[in-house]
Amino acid sequence: MKVGILGGGQLALMMVDSFIDKNVEFIVLDPSDKPPASKRVKCIKAKYDDKEYLDFLAKECDVVTIDF
């Protein structure tokens, strides 16, 4: 399963950590240079209203959630 997360803050990091042994892949979209979730997973630097990257998450992920 592939999960997209809008926002790469501490909640996103805790979500990623809770699925570490569950064979779940994450894609995180966050506008900051080094969000907390980037310690564990690849983060895409983009604004939350960037249509191109929102479309990418919608197409690539089985589910998308929000971290804020």
Segments predicted by a language model, with ranges:
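ATP-binding N-terminal substructure of ATP-dependent carboxylate-amine bond-forming enzymes
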Residues: 1-68
